Amino acid sequence: VSFSVDEGSIFGLIGPNGAGKTTMFNVLTGLYVHDEGTFAFRGSTLQQMTPDRIAALGIARTFQNIRLFANLSAIENVMIGRHVRTKAGVWGAIARDAATRTEEAAIERRSHELLQFVGLDARANDLSKHLSYGDQRRLEIARALATDPKVLALDEPAAGMNATEKLALRELIVAIRAQGITVLLIEHDVKLVMGLCDRIAVLDYGKKIAEGLPQDVQRDPNVIEAYLGAEVAA
C-alpha cells in the first residue's frame, strides 16, 4: 500500500470490513511495526518508533473502540492527553514547584479551550462514562487535539452517531482542518467521506485498489466490485 497526503487536507481511507484500514492506522501511529517499506512524515523517515514518540512528533489518533478513562472527568481526560507537551517531568510533578503549578494551570486552561472547541465545555466536570456515545467521540477528539498534532487520524469517528451528531461531527472536522491540521479519516459512512474528503484511497484485502478525488473513486469499477460484488459491478 502506498499513498501520500497533502498537508492541510482531509484524506479518507475506506474499504469493506477487514480491508486493513485500522491496521494501516496502527502502523502509522506506532502500535504495529511494519515488516517492510517506509513511512515519511514532514521530510523525515520514521522507523520503529513507539506511539508516544510519534505523538510527540505531531501525529495523534482516535480509536475505533472508544478508549477514555471512564471514571475521570472530561477535563481530566483532555489534560492527560496534554502530557506529551509538558516540561516538568516526574520530579517536577513530585516536588510541585512553582513552575509545575504554572504549567498545570496552563494545561487546564488549554483543556477547557479544547472542550469548548468540540462543544463539551459545559460537561467538563462530568465523568466520561456519563457522557452520550456521540459526546464520548467528541471528547476523544479533544484529547487527541491536546497533543497539538500536525496530523489527526480519526478511526470511524461517526460510528454509532445519529444524523444530527454526524452533521456536527462534519462541521468539527472542517473546523479542525481550518486550524491547519491534516486529517486522516477512516469511515464506513461513505456519504460523509465523499462530502468531506479532498482525496480518498480504497483498500481491499490489504491492497490499495483505488485513489483519487471522491467523485472518481465513487465511479471506479474496482471500488464498486469491492463493496457490491462482481456481479453487481458488471
Which ranges hold each PLM region?
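Glycine-rich phosphate-binding loops of nucleotide-dependent enzymes
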Residues: 1-234
